[in-house]
Amino acid sequence: MKVVVLAGGISTERDVSLSSGAGIYQALKENGHRVILLDIFLGLPDVQEPLEELFDREFDWAASVRGVAEKAPDLERVKAQRPGFRSLLGPNVLELCSLCDMVFLGLHGANGEDGRIQALFDLMGIRYTGTGHTGSALCMDKNITKQMFRGFGIPTPPSITVKKGEAYELPETIGFPCMVKTCCGGSSVGVYRVEDVFGLDRALAKAFSYEDEVLIERCIPGREFSIAVVEGKALPIIEIAPISGFYDYKNKYQAGSTVETCPADLPQNITARMQKHAEDACAVLGIEGYARVDFMLDERSGEDYALEANTLPGMTPTSLMPQEAAALGMSYAELCEWILNVSLKKYEPGGNRP
């Protein structure tokens, strides 16, 4: 199968996306597919040969991809590589995607996980992995996601949204400590734990440097978990325990910063309940194929709370979803093949795509 793996782009999660894309590319190549790894923003300029021939070129498309740095990338430096750009799609990106049998989306964050590229591909008849444009857009905005959770009875922490420059009052249902989060950010970029009103003002100022709308959410004391869902069925639960602080950008991507345990050490009744909540969350949000739902388990009440859903979860070989698949005895390459095959089903007769 001819596959284009799309990664990179102009997002605070750019480095994570490139790392995911490199892993997916290598796995699909090992599986015998004809694969190209493309940076969706930089594209592939100055191509001399017919684009079709690139799928058979003896070339390591992942050779220039580096690991994930401790801090989010400098996007202005990335933009400078395409001076005067008007389109967020680089040279030959759409052309190569139109030639392949499937686009494997290794994108994360804005312009990749928010439904825009999915809508464009739907209009152009380009097949791609994962959820469609509507479900992707719903899940990209944490405020909308949480409203959907509440409307369908899925427990989620109390929260309010605050717009830049807007007056607000913190309800008693939230109080301190609380979490400040950008509504549409990912990889915990723009996420801060706040202990008091002075810290809240500082955290809001930082969060507003990323987006104009911010979520303030009750901080649930306890343990953090994540649950991948594939074709409506939950995988084994993984527990995430940072060595210090909370699960921020640094703790997510720097080796040795976090202890991750899969399957999580939980009573069977809590495991079943959380997996059911993850499956219900994906159904409510219109997830297609696969996703990952993040949870907190309250150490006082024993209740679990859904935080958000990730329609394109991290796919570096050490990311959470690959670890959950490994608990089922599935290799990373087998997981990538599974996602590819699951995504193909929506384009079969009777599927939900043209």
Model-inferred region functions:
Residues M1-A7, S11, S19, G90-C97, ...:
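Active-site nucleotide/adenylate-binding loops and adjacent lid/helix of ATP-dependent enzymes
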Residues M1-T134, L138-M140, I144, G151, ...:
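ATP-binding N-terminal substructure of ATP-dependent carboxylate-amine bond-forming enzymes
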Residues V35, R127-Y128, T156, C178, ...:
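Hydrophobic beta-strand scaffold residues
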Residues A119-Y128, D196, D201, A327-G329:
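A glycine- and small-aliphatic-rich helix-loop capping segment at beta-alpha/alpha-beta transitions
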Residues E195-K276, E299, E303-Y305:
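Phosphate-binding site of ATP-dependent enzymes
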Residues R218, I227-V229, C282-M315, A325:
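Conserved metal-phosphate-binding beta-hairpin within the catalytic cores
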Residues E288, E303-P354:
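C-terminal active-site "lid" helix and adjoining low-complexity regulatory extension at the edge
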